[in-house]
Amino acid sequence: MKNLFIKTAVALLVAAAAFTSCDRCERVKGDPMKSLIYTLDNGLKVYMTVNKEEPRIQTYIAVRSGGKNDPHETTGLAHYFEHLMFKGSEQFGTSDYAAEKPLLDEIERLFEEYRTITDPAERLEMYRRIDSVSYEASKIAIPNEYDKLMGMIGARGTNAWTSQDETVYTEDIPSNQLENWAIVQADRFRHNVIRGFHTELEAVYEEKNMSLTSDTEKLFEALQAGLFKNHPYGTQTVLGTQEQLKNPSIVNIKNYYNTFYVPNNIAICLSGDFNPREALALVKKYFGDWAPNPDIPTLKYEAEEPITTPIEKDVYGLEAEMVALAWRLPGSRDLKATSVGEVASSVLCNGRAGLIDLDINMQQKVMQMYAFDNTQPDYSMFVTLGMPKQGQTLEQVRDLALEEVAKLAAGDFDESLLESTVNNIRLRRMRQLENNSNRARLFVEAFIAGIPWKDACKDIDRYASVTKEDVMAFAQEYLRPENFVVVYKRMGEDTSIEKISAPAITPIETNRDKSSAFLQSIQDKEVKPIEPSFPDFSKDLSAGQLAQGVNLLYKKNTLNEIATVELLYNRGKLQDPALEDAFAYLQYLGTSEMSAAEISARMYELACYFSFDCDDNSSSIMVSGLSDNVPEALGIVEKLILGAEPDEGILAALKADLFKARDDAKKSQDACFDALTDYVMHGPEYVKRTTLSSADLSSLSSEQLLGKLRELFEKGHEVLYYGPLSKEEATKTIAAAHHMADNPEPLAEEFAPTVQTPSSKVLVAPYTAANFYYYQFSNRGEKYDPAQTARIRLYNEYFGGGMNGIVFQEMREARGLAYSASARLREPSWKDGEYGFYAYIASQNDKLVKAVENFDDIINDMPESERAFDIAKQGLLSRMRTQRYRGLRLLDYYRNCRRLGLDEPLDKAVFEELQGLTLEDVKAIQKQWVAGRTYTYGILGDPADLDMPYLRMLGPVKTLTLEDIFGY
């Protein structure tokens, strides 16, 4: 105890010294986050904001460097290095760095030679040598040790991203693990070692493959290329070219790391439950002697020439047609232009009352049109994006967008939109500040752009100062009718995509039972445990009746003045597949008192919004916004549902758009895979039951659709309230605005069952692409048993739990088979539901056989590791200690437990049981619940590129049509 006291006292003295010795500190009066910003002597920025809603801290480490800083001959480097930052250092990720280093040096040398070879046979032979040395190096390496470290301390959301301007590393950690986090991050950033290079290269290439099937990504790359002839925003992409990705340079990567990964180019951003003084002391202790780079190169580029005539480009692909227009703007460092641009884009399109919203979307002139400003530090973009109706040309959509943009310069908009826009921005910021991730992201954005916090945190004041004249002048200067780029995304084959075969890779050693002394030191470090706080439904929320047949779930919002009212009805697509079309129709209609445009404009003025949602088993009507205005907003929505005036012209146009949307969905790889997954899990009867046939859709009348919505109000339902009013006030307010029948008909919940899989079979759906999507599913009919929950959750954590799980290690790290892969034992969502097991992977077509074989191997013969198990268990327990249910999330959690027949959540019992479980329990789950299953394998891909004879070895193969899986 005495030693603990001494250590604490020393820590506080160090913290105080850190505060007083810091010569560059910043606080801003009136900052709603009460932020503290410090610059250490080595240039490292530390941004902090305290939020004690849960005992966790969102951390971002932001590097002011991204794709724009890539060498021209090795584009994609910044993003690739982001991946390599997860491979460890000299202290972790290896069992013997001294023995490993000569092999890593040889791999580096071989890759430098490899990238100069053009002869295919010589390249193949060189890659065999690289693979051989890499395998030897893998015997010493300890893959995924970083992820083990983060899992061990209870981190969530371990990840990173790279854009043109930034590379950001994210962890959400328990509050008591800040020092361990700092120790690991300091070592990782200061002493990175590049290992696991060739298998990670395959993962990066799979990510590139996925981007090549995204026509939206290709469209935006073309926009940037048109706008920026000199700046890297337009001359190179974050993911790089296919050719350069296959010819990487470890030398260039190391040079990049040494140049940009330095303290005077990095910010640590923290938001959560912590003591800023202690946090700063830790940062200074572990990062303070990190040497800066006084010679960080400034990005050099020639200023862009003015665009004097529209630049037109075409891109091709299988997805639905669209057209985008973009104008070049000053970068986000120009605070005035950025503020006016944000307001101007909201006047043009805000989802409710903007010019495009009312003049284009509400009038059904196109399928859909959007506008937004895309801010970047060096140059920003003002963008419109439009999808054509059936029979409409992209040029016609372009002209409609130009007409709306021209209204900004002409001042052809109501000045009241400016005040409404600022109020809605204030509401959006209020919501942002509820969440640690959003709070810390505000720091990241300011740091990357080089905007002082005193300016960044006053952005709403700048928005409020924008006048109509400012918007007009902005549009006249930047949004002229001749200085834009237009990209037409047309249907057709993209001939620029190169088909590259996957190299032969020897699976590297995973060394699960090895651990570094560094990891052991972190594991042995004692921290004061955070006491768990499990939900108590009798105290944490209030459940009662609003009226006969109408239940109320209430939770008070103590954070801000936002209120949300949600009406939930146990009727969804299973009971009536036309319900979602009825909700879609309603949004175009008005009442005898207000037109549709007036409703949208009034809701925007109130800083409120409403939404309708229809899933398999329920329909939701939600109203949310500033608490004082929610009663009026709820009244408007209720009057609309009960008194909507039909319009047959609108309905006819809606039907045409729905048919077009169906055709477009069949062109989307993601939509096709979603449909195939539903078909695999639920079967053809489910598809038929939840999908209107074309004939049924055509025959729908206004009276049918609006009648379905009015009927909902005659049914029993549940009302969720989360807001600042007391329960008594909320009850009175809702009762006054909400229509409730005298004797509402009760509606029982009905759920979509999953199909049992007594024998294995293969379902193949066609989609022409360089990669396949794969989903295997098994249901043996086992019913929900709450006694199994703790063991199943621990199995899922060990086997499929993120980057530390067996799946990630085997499928991505060891074999380079995919960018993403997952597998888990699915627990039922209602008490009579059944367990299922699924596995998912996406990869290039020539990796199909290896992917399926290796998945089946690890599923049926699960690798066993006491070390990996201990880390999985420790991480799961740590996350449960810091798990908190707040706001609407608590009400949803209560409803989920109720569906499972639970009066109280299982969390406490699961937490207690987990502490006594061993690897033997996980092995027992695998043996009893997972091994030896029969599956339905669903594969979306090009049959001409798939190994069909191999698939027939898995079971009978049935080739489906897109009509089969979509139901139309």
Model-inferred region functions:
Residues 1-9:
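Bacterial N-terminal signal peptides that target proteins for export
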Residues 9-17:
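Bacterial N-terminal signal peptides
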Residues 16-31:
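Bacterial Sec-dependent signal peptides at the C-terminal "C-region" and cleavage site
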Residues 28-62, 540-559:
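Mature N-terminal segment immediately following signal peptide/propeptide cleavage
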Residues 39-42, 97-297, 363-524, 601-747, ...:
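Charge-rich, well-structured scaffold segments of protease-associated domains
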Residues 51-53, 62-66, 89-90, 174-176, ...:
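Solvent-exposed coil/turn segments that connect beta secondary-structure elements
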Residues 52-101, 325, 335-348, 549, ...:
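Active/ligand-binding-proximal structured segments within catalytic/core domains
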Residues 206-212, 225, 295-353, 385, ...:
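His/Glu-based metal-binding/catalytic segments typifying zinc-dependent metallopeptidases
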